[in-house]
Amino acid sequence: MTKPIRRRDFLRLAALGGSAAVTAFLQACADAGIDPATVAPTIALPTPTTAPIQPTADTSPTLVPQEPTMTAPLPTAVPTQTAQDGTARIAFVKTTDRAGGVRQAVELLGINPVAEKSVFLKPNFNSADPAPGSTHPDVLAALVAMLKEMGASKITVGDRSGMGDTRQVMETLGVFRLAEQLGFDTIVFDELAAEDWVMVETPAGHWQQGFPFARPVLDAGAVVQTCCLKTHQYGGHFTLSLKNSVGLVGKRIQTVDHDFMNELHSSEHQRRMIAEINAAYTPALVVMDGVDAFISGGPHRGELASPGVILAGTDRVALDAVGIALLRYFGCRTQAAQGRIFDQEQIARAVELGLGVDTPEKIEFVTSDADSAAYAETIKQALLAG
């Protein structure tokens, strides 16, 4: 059974195509014997006009989904923060104190994109394993506290686990108990209704029929993400901010008979498909917990290292590039350590889609103390060399 089209989506279609588009849409439904109120919306993401490379055969904007289609919603947050010269600022805090490090990193950015907005906070609840297998409770609590101080009108935390039942994972990690203590809402994506998923297609994308993206994320006033620092042994090569967005995609939805996660993890294009998910939304803020890391294995368990760092920024490409440099510096010898960082498929496809900076030279580290500055300079050199 198809999900009903929302009045908001119908009006957006009208605004995009005018009365002629609506008339054509209704006539097509009548010819096919379809009730237009039951047509499921599809979002076709526009080709970015600010992509740092010219369109190629792989990024051609000429491929369009079948009618009816709608353009992507307005960004759920401020655009990726870049300076006038095109650089991305990454706050870099050397610390083993997660709560203090989160606060310091966010303050270093000097931004407040959440004031008076409803905020969706995306953690890493892929499994019930302790950090870096999943988001550390100190990171989650510190972020919620900061978002409240910054004036967020409402905070909702949600995810879809890749390993195990999401509700059970969140229960084991103490998320619901923390929600009661700190006063935030929770969403278990496994339990969303059909109308709470939106099919998204990217230009020249590698998904067979697009992918279902969680509507609560698109409806939020701002999206904040927190990810871990680790490798990924099941084809992703690394799982940082770009890969963390996979939890916003449904495995199965009621209106489509398809296993989207099986498609993703069995595809030779898996890493490109990961990047394409990120074209569906723009985070207002991303915090990476690098106090501990997996330099092999992952995402749930692996070889542990202790980089002792918290990063924050708004550019997912820049953050992930720095994350890969950290993994390499601490001895990673998996596929994430092979080739140039910006040639990694997740990074390269994200750059094609205009999701962040296109060279390591455009990444600026922001620190507040001598130890962090010295550490950042070391990682910067590893980044430039990679």
Label every PLM stretch briefly.
Residues 2-5, 9-25, 29-39, 43, ...:
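N-terminal and secondary-structure boundary signal
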